[in-house]
Amino acid sequence: MLKLFAAIAAAVMFGMPLVAHANNDSELQSIRNEIEQLKQSYEKRIEALEKRLKDAEAKAAQAEASASQAQTAAETASARPASANAFNPAVSVILEGTYQNLSQNPNTFRIGGFIPPQNEGVGERGFSLGDSELNFAANIDPYFKGNLTVSLQADNSVEVEEAWFQTLGLSHGLTAKGGRFFSGIGYLNEIHQHNWDFYNAPLAYQVFLGTGPIGNYSNDGVQLKWIAPTDLFMELGAEAGNGNNFPGNGDQNGVGTWALYDHVGGDIGDSYAYRGGISYLQAWPSNRQYSAFDAAGTPVINSFSGNSRLLIGDFVLKWAPHGNSTSTNFKLQGEYMYRIEKGILDFNSVSTTPVPGPYSSYQSGWYLQGVYQFMPRWRFGLRRDQLSSGTVNVGQVQYGILPPQDFPILLGYTPKRSTVMLDYSPSEFSRFRLQYAYDQSRPTGVDDNEWTLQYIFSLGSHGAHTF
């Protein structure tokens, strides 16, 4: 536009001299034509720019409308209840089986010196399906996630191992969990059996937590954990449950058991890592029964009611050269348990003439194991278990009402077991294990030679393993 005005101004300024000196009208007309051409040229360019501006504004308006429609659609979708097709949890299956050769009858297995839980044992002879699992896990919404683990037993029964929800949005390192879950006490208990380094649980887990040969101690209740915001790993946990499982029995209202624990851990250089902890479990069993025999060999049912307190110390040390565990690594693991029980022991409690008496016991047990991966995929392990029946005070015996032989399972004994294993893992989804145990836990003094061949296959997604 400035050039147009300049041209017009120039024409006005020089128009008179041009007219004055023009030789004829054709020269004047030529100048006018040039001015007209300049005007038309600039007008066309202005029109083109105005058209481009309108097109750009139209496209911007269209984009804004599309964004608004997309936002509306997203809000509608989020407000709509999730359909069955939208439910997409992580699903995994654990296939496990064993072949066992046992020199003693597994049906007569008892650990001497301790009130027996209902499911103590060594497994089954011959081929067995083992403890296969079906697991579902998913985030429920931005605030919770859920997990369901169903165990398929060798006797074709189905058991809900875990069914819990856990918070995702709590701040300051806090997480809360509710439902049925493996307790966080000790070290081994939170780890599923297919991730253990040996086929079966330590003897201390059987007599103090009632896990059986391949189980975990679980509860129906609530759990609260806190991870400290420090370079050193520090975890504090508290739990309250119904106490249905040994050492409780759930025969009461309200809270039947509660637990507290503290775990700390960290790195030592670039090749070592450790974790240690202390845990406390308290239960209030009421009429907790167990089957036994009296001095004459007659079957009887005894029951205990009172208070059961368990203290656990655990420690794990891992070594991998410069943090690389692919070729070689070593893991040292151990736990110590000390239990105090006080209350009333009813002799032959289901008869018409039960004989009650005060009861107290101070007992302990431990295990220590080491597992060495000496080359990729191959591992070798050793474990030692030992229990001490400690001090057991049976009122009926102390007061001369009944002879000690009426409580044969509670006579002093030191159960122990030595285990060696070799396993091979073609991949992270499969493992084959050969295990031998020399078991001296029976009070009869008859030792058991236990050979186990085990396979483990993992199908589908699975989470990271515990430290």
Report each predicted region and the residues it spans.
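Bacterial N-terminal signal peptides that target proteins for export
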Residues: 1-7
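C-terminal segment of classical bacterial N-terminal signal peptides
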Residues: 13-21
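N-terminal periplasmic/intermembrane-space "pro-region" immediately following the signal or transit peptide
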Residues: 21-111, 115-117, 233, 454, ...
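Conserved aromatic-histidine-acidic binding/catalytic patches
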Residues: 34, 212, 250, 303
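Intrinsically disordered, low-complexity acidic Ser/Thr-rich regulatory segments
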Residues: 76-83, 120, 301-302, 406-408
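Outer membrane beta-barrel
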Residues: 80-246, 252-270, 280, 317, ...
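Outer-membrane beta-barrel pore domains
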Residues: 164, 197, 272-467
